[in-house]
Amino acid sequence: MGRFIFISFGLLVVFFFLSGAKGSTCPFHWLPMYGLCYKIFDKLKTWNDAEMFCRKYKPGCHLASLHSKRDSIEFAEYISDYRKGWGNVWIGMWGRKEGLTCEWTDGSSTTYVAWKQNLTDHYLNKDLFCAEIVSYTGYRLWNKQDCKVKNAFLCQCGF
């Protein structure tokens, strides 16, 4: 009887590790949230180059999408802990100057936004804008920025 329990327990442990292997852990210095992993990259890139970097890092990766105030707080703490420099950070939202809609690069819904008050129209002469998390707000609020500006960036990936 004891041997049966020992073998059953061993098989259960093996099954647990095999069934949870995909998507259950993030690499070192990545933030695990909602079954995805997030990482700040300090290399300064334009918004398009940052999105391409994320996509090339691993298939299915994109610039990060934030969907709640709780997300904003978690990311603000993570960025503050791991960002080596100072400055704004690209996220995966973009939009057109004409029109009221924005889109996430991963195709998820845009029901939550955290625009700072008195948005700076750095993209005024451009058709498109890209969203950045603003450093002087403690990385909690966003700004619309010219997509050609170079910033650090936050990628999201499934592992």
From Swiss-Prot:
Which residues form each disulfide bond in the chain?
Answer: 26-37, 54-155, 61-157, 130-147
Subunit description: Homodimer; disulfide-linked.
As recorded in UniProt, coiled-coil segments are none
Q: Where is the signal peptide?
A: 1-23
Its Gene Ontology molecular function terms? Answer: carbohydrate binding; metal ion binding
Q: Pfam families recorded for this chain? A: Lectin_C (PF00059)
Keywords in alphabetical order: Calcium, Disulfide bond, Glycoprotein, Lectin, Metal-binding, Secreted, Signal
Species name: Bitis gabonica
**Organism classification:** Eukaryota, Metazoa, Chordata, Craniata, Vertebrata
> Could you confirm whether the keyword Ribosomal protein appears in this record?
no
Where on this protein are sugars attached? 118
Q: Which domain of life is it from?
A: Eukaryota
Protein family (similarity comment): Belongs to the true venom lectin family.
GO cellular component terms attached to this protein's record: extracellular region
For this entry, the protein name equals: C-type lectin 1
